[in-house]
Amino acid sequence: MSKKLSLSGQSRKTVEEVFNDFVISQTAQGLSEITIATYRCHIHSISKHLDIQKPMNALTKGDLEAMVVSMRRSGLAHNSISSYCRVLRTFLNWSKRNGWNSPFLYASNREMYL
């Protein structure tokens, strides 16, 4: 008997919960432990500048722009911000492919300085 995955309840998930799903998916696909550790470290750093307890479907372009501004104001190096944004872009692209159909999520990787 096969078990179907239910997408109900997806709209109530926070950014952090969806990110955890992303990490599980990437681990299952065989990404190295070092890459997974980097993702976890980066989301921890990102959470200082972006509310990851916010519902995923409520994430806006403005939230990400405010995150970048906050990172710049806190004195983070350009390379650090770029690294965090690359991980976030990878996560947002995965989110789009996995049913998070906000038009913002698709547009974000081209419109933002990520």
Regions from the PLM with identified roles:
Residues S2-S6, N20-L114:
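N-terminal core-binding DNA-recognition domain of tyrosine recombinases/integrases
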Residues L7-E16:
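A detector for short, charged/polar N-terminal pre-domain segments
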